[in-house]
């Protein structure tokens, strides 16, 4: 099913997407530019679905690591928080990133909660103690063996992102020209990484590993 509110005939209904889509790019360049952008942002919004209501909930999360050549994302979590309940009920997830220049990325996939001690220790950082606290019972101390510390691994399925391809002055001029002429502004490199491209990238990195 799709939504449409009008018929533009033989005219392109979404000229912005047509003008900014960057399709002649290798999978390697697509993924590497995406992962560089994500690493620079560091903080993203994680969106999950609440099991009993179906409501979408987002919260800010700090990137803790990347796997599969950068396409799969790692986050710390308190296993007793609401987001782990959401993921246990529905593993579908979205992670989005945005910077002050208007560049953005959206990764759609599935999430898994990992409590394996070796994995937790691999990604553990002492600053986690500031978020979990020390409950004073000798077990829940915010350290690497605190059973409340888990890992959320986001296995990417698809990704869409936009990075800027022109200077700020050029973008302003392009937008002004668009307002005057009615022609869509060309200001971003709008890229999509398909499910097949994600699978290809993940497989190629497994062979390297």
Spans of model-derived segments:
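Short, structured beta-strand-loop surface elements
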Residues: 82-149
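Short N-terminal helix-initiation segments at or just after the protein's N-terminus
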Residues: 3-15, 35-40, 56, 89-99
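C-terminal edge-of-domain segments
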Residues: 2-23, 142-209
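Short Pro/Gly-enriched beta-strand edge/turn motifs at strand-loop
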Residues: 40-47, 131-136
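Short beta-strand segments
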Residues: 42-79, 85-88, 93-99, 104-112
